Amino acid sequence: MAPISIADIVAALPAEDTWGPVTSADNMLDGVPYAPFSKGDKLGRMADWTADSKDRDRGGRQAYNRNYRDQQVYGAGSSSLFAVQVAEDESTFSVVDNTRTSAKRTFGRGGGTVFRGRAQRGGAGQRGGRAGFQRVGAGRGQGGDRYYDNRGARGNRGRRFGWKDYDKPQRTREPSVNIRPDWSMLEEVDFNRLSKLNLQAPEGEDVDTYGFLYYYDRSYDKAPVKNAERRLQALDRAAYNVTTSQDPVIQELAEKNQATIFATSDILSMLMCAPRSVYSWDIVIVHQGNKIYFDKREGASLDLVTVNENAADAPLEVAESSGKQESINTPSALALEATFINHNFALQTVVEANNAKVDFNHPNPFYNAEEETEPLASKGYKYRRFDLSLESDEEPLNMIVRTEVDALVKNPVNGEDQQLVVKALNEFDSKAQGSGGSLDWRSKLYSQRGAVVATEMKNNSCKLARWTTQAILAKADGMKLGFVSRANPRSAAAHVVLGVAGYKPREFAAQMNLNLGNGWGIVRTIVDRIRALDADEEEDKVTKYILVKDPNRPVLRLYSVPANAFEEDDEAAEEEQEAKGEVEEA
């Protein structure tokens, strides 16, 4: 075989082709356009319109060129095999401000809601920091992008909440009585423990009755004519609200050993409805021998009718409202206004006629015709006894309560007299701070009465619970709730009666989820604690305590006070009243 020459092989190669496999210019594969690709590329998407936007907020032309030009997600790597590379023509280049301006929506002068994190480095749609929800509360002198809480002067960083910061009171209220250094705290009970107590007590029995009653004016039950509402009148009538230990009837019953515990319905209802209360209040407890008296101080807050105490945004004092709140809408001013309304509404809604007057067993025990110049108000006092004994008690434990009723009404079926408790709810300004989102009574009272009453149950839960408890303690047959509004929302001088609604006390208690068994359980627990504290004391020794509701926490505190506590305050109050009387006479 002849030897193979390398020169012959090289000479036999085609001169027009290069070294390697045969090159094909066909870009079709079985009739389908074919593009070269790399096996390392991730396939599966026809196009990608969600390119990475981590640097999207960095403005400028260089950022645009770096992030958005020549982005080929489908193909060989991140470079383009098909784009035509042309020289950049900068002849028509101009700087354009592409900064995104976000228009913040505000409520009034400030206060929108934005969803934004603590750190603002990322772009739109990011997760943000821990505080995912912040409220913008810009005032007149603040920027629109300030956060709600600016107490720490943090600017745009917002407020970092600490341990149990949510449980701290939003506002600081003053206690109803100044805690003195010589008082010693004996017990502290939170409302959660109180709400678990229960004692099923009987309905009670009447011991004696005093006073008289007029009949209720049924014309107030009718819907008033528009723009012709009845004005609330200020009537001069003699009405009394004497504390327990100064009641001559209770003193007589105590001497006869008719009961061991004595109280009035307004004091007892506050204690039974304590878990619903928000404002501070106090009850003086006197233990003398084997008798326990639940008393109140002179000028105590128990005598005032609160307004929107349980509202989520309760009325503010002037110092707390940054000068925007009018003085007539503060809690103290509203309480005085509501007390005035309740006193006069009960007097105005009865028909004062001597021929339609029903006398109780005894006359009014507090009225002295020789000293008083004003006529007596329609009021009936019922002294009722309740048995708080347990099966384990060696001796019965009875309680006498002075209850009150305001008017009578004829039963339309059998014609019998039914006793009523008359109270009034008041509207000050449905658009003002502290209104609790209440509806406009003038336009909604008769078309949406259920919604109006439901709102009042929410905003005045404690007040309505006390009134219902007082009606049940008095064994009243019905309740009349008046709806009284200001004639002018900016003035507390004149009021109009918009309507009256009637309820049965037991049914009304069921509507507002009022459990009287829990209230009796609270009373029995306090009584047992007082008796246990004085178990080793002498029988004739007088010990005095005060039960105080914390103004800022749902807590009751029991203090031991000196036996002569509050007597100086009562004497000073009497001297002040005498001085005022002398000045008026002069």
UniProtKB/Swiss-Prot annotation:
Domain of life: Eukaryota
The protein's assembly and partners: Component of the eukaryotic translation initiation factor 3 (eIF-3) complex.
Keywords: Cytoplasm, Initiation factor, Protein biosynthesis, RNA-binding
Any single GO CC term annotated in Swiss-Prot or TrEMBL for this entry: eukaryotic translation initiation factor 3 complex
Region (RNA gate): 301-315
Pfam name, any one: eIF-3_zeta
Broad class of the protein's primary localization: cytoplasm
Listed GO MF terms: mRNA cap binding; translation initiation factor activity
Biased segments, Gly residues type: 108-131
Region annotated Disordered, chain positions: 107-154, 566-586
Function of the protein: mRNA cap-binding component of the eukaryotic translation initiation factor 3 (eIF-3) complex, which is involved in protein synthesis of a specialized repertoire of mRNAs and, together with other initiation factors, stimulates binding of mRNA and methionyl-tRNAi to the 40S ribosome. The eIF-3 complex specifically targets and initiates translation of a subset of mRNAs involved in cell proliferation. In the eIF-3 complex, eif3d specifically recognizes and binds the 7-methylguanosine cap of a subset of mRNAs.
InterPro entries: eIF3d (IPR007783)
Natural source organism: Emericella nidulans (strain FGSC A4 / ATCC 38163 / CBS 112.46 / NRRL 194 / M139)
Protein name: Eukaryotic translation initiation factor 3 subunit D
HAMAP family: eIF3d
